[in-house]
Amino acid sequence: MAAAAGMLLLGLLQAGGSVLGQAMEKVTGGNLLSMLLIACAFTLSLVYLIRLAAGHLVQLPAGVKSPPYIFSPIPFLGHAIAFGKSPIEFLENAYEKYGPVFSFTMVGKTFTYLLGSDAAALLFNSKNEDLNAEDVYSRLTTPVFGKGVAYDVPNPVFLEQKKMLKSGLNIAHFKQHVSIIEKETKEYFESWGESGEKNVFEALSELIILTASHCLHGKEIRSQLNEKVAQLYADLDGGFSHAAWLLPGWLPLPSFRRRDRAHREIKDIFYKAIQKRRQSQEKIDDILQTLLDATYKDGRPLTDDEVAGMLIGLLLAGQHTSSTTSAWMGFFLARDKTLQKKCYLEQKTVCGENLPPLTYDQLKDLNLLDRCIKETLRLRPPIMIMMRMARTPQTVAGYTIPPGHQVCVSPTVNQRLKDSWVERLDFNPDRYLQDNPASGEKFAYVPFGAGRHRCIGENFAYVQIKTIWSTMLRLYEFDLIDGYFPTVNYTTMIHTPENPVIRYKRRSK
């Protein structure tokens, strides 16, 4: 059977190549880009047929149950259209019908979802050799961060790199960061004037880049962050797209070209800053210096290319979380003016009636603001899906997931399951006054992930968001425009607010 299948697939390749060559000349008139796109479409379809044929050759062992499979009559695309249109509704409906574990196909790939705390434990407790992260994320991150870092290296090396970065994300540095972020925020909002309507997501995205670059990259790199460099960051960030995940990286797409050019130019800026720091022999207590002084277990120091790649990764990985969360929280506070007033009064209670400059210790005592961030992350986690590739068979809830499946957990769904959360769709920061707001379930609340791949920048994100919003609340009152509260934009990898324009008015002194 295997030999017959192999001959069949070989025949498909030969016949397809002949037909494709003749057809492309007629249809495209020899246009290179058109021929390339048709070739890609043919290749994708052929890959799907090969996987389909190979799948039929695999026989499950007797007594092994595969997860419930949601059938689609549409070849290759599968449920991609329905899922892309409303992913949360799709997953919640599947959970109601099939339970916590189920599979379906999109664009030739099979996805198995683990919903609810018990099922999600498989992913968060797994070893990397069983449920692998690099197999899923490397094609997205490597063109953006560069080779030799993050998911482009073996997991033990990546863990060493994360440990180096984490050592620089410490309380001593956070205490320095608060005043830096407050100053950057005040300067940024000087241009807003007394009142108006602004796209708060765009504004906060720009501000997050400014503050993160200053805190995480050092003064040398921050001093070069002008409009041109900000656009380079935006182009680089554009590499985190559905197209980058689904399509080969060598395709001559405009967004891919912009990403690759931005990567080269930003690294050149970093190389100059790194060389300047090395040559000066000046020891500045920041993350750049932490990386320059760091060594692997075998004693090898980081190369300039590794340092630059890790700095890019540190900035962009956190930029999404902070900018999206900050924007969504603004709309939740604008919708609930009573809560917004309480957050403002908390500033005076904790920091003093005259609202002096913020300190790290004061920031820690802003408990209501802290709970507002937590609740925003519950209802609007920036990353809707966390994925791993199954390399070995995995058993969960009585089902066996075969190798080759992309195994997924959705924080968005887990964080509002009616089985786990009381008044699950309500924005209620006071739910965190309880010790176990999610019935004590370990993986019911995972906006920063869990286990070996938990986000190392969580504490910095809280410092950054709390400082920015403390400053914004001191400066302005915020309102929805004609009661409009944004819907979720599902067309991007990070789920941002749709048309995020907010109304503001400067507080009277």
Curated annotation (Swiss-Prot):
A GO BP annotation: negative regulation of protein catabolic process
Compartments in which it is found: Endoplasmic reticulum membrane; Microsome membrane
The protein's required cofactors: heme
Principal location class: endoplasmic reticulum
Enzyme class: oxidoreductase
Keywords assigned: Cholesterol biosynthesis, Cholesterol metabolism, Endoplasmic reticulum, Heme, Iron, Lipid biosynthesis, Lipid metabolism, Membrane, Metal-binding, Microsome, Monooxygenase, Oxidoreductase, Steroid biosynthesis, Steroid metabolism, Sterol biosynthesis, Sterol metabolism, Transmembrane, Transmembrane helix, Ubl conjugation
Transmembrane segments: 30-50
Gene Ontology CC annotation, any one: membrane
EC numbers: 1.14.14.154
Post-translational modification note: Ubiquitinated by MARCHF6, leading to proteasomal degradation.
Known catalytic reactions: a 14alpha-methyl steroid + 3 reduced [NADPH--hemoprotein reductase] + 3 O2 = a Delta(14) steroid + formate + 3 oxidized [NADPH--hemoprotein reductase] + 4 H2O + 4 H(+); lanosterol + 3 reduced [NADPH--hemoprotein reductase] + 3 O2 = 4,4-dimethyl-5alpha-cholesta-8,14,24-trien-3beta-ol + formate + 3 oxidized [NADPH--hemoprotein reductase] + 4 H2O + 4 H(+); 24,25-dihydrolanosterol + 3 reduced [NADPH--hemoprotein reductase] + 3 O2 = 4,4-dimethyl-8,14-cholestadien-3beta-ol + formate + 3 oxidized [NADPH--hemoprotein reductase] + 4 H2O + 4 H(+); a 14alpha-methyl steroid + reduced [NADPH--hemoprotein reductase] + O2 = a 14alpha-hydroxymethyl steroid + oxidized [NADPH--hemoprotein reductase] + H2O + H(+)
Regulation: Inhibited by azalanstat. Inhibited by azole antifungal agents ketoconazole, itraconazole and fluconazole.
Transmembrane helix in keyword set: yes
Positions contributing to heme binding: 455
A Pfam short name: p450
Keyword hit for Translocase: no
Mode of membrane association: Single-pass membrane protein
Pathway entry: Steroid biosynthesis; zymosterol biosynthesis; zymosterol from lanosterol: step 1/6
The family this protein is said to belong to: Belongs to the cytochrome P450 family.
Biological role stated in the UniProt entry: Sterol 14alpha-demethylase that plays a critical role in the cholesterol biosynthesis pathway, being cholesterol the major sterol component in mammalian membranes as well as a precursor for bile acid and steroid hormone synthesis.
Protein name, UniProt field: Lanosterol 14-alpha demethylase
Upper lineage: Eukaryota, Metazoa, Chordata, Craniata, Vertebrata
Primary gene name: CYP51A1
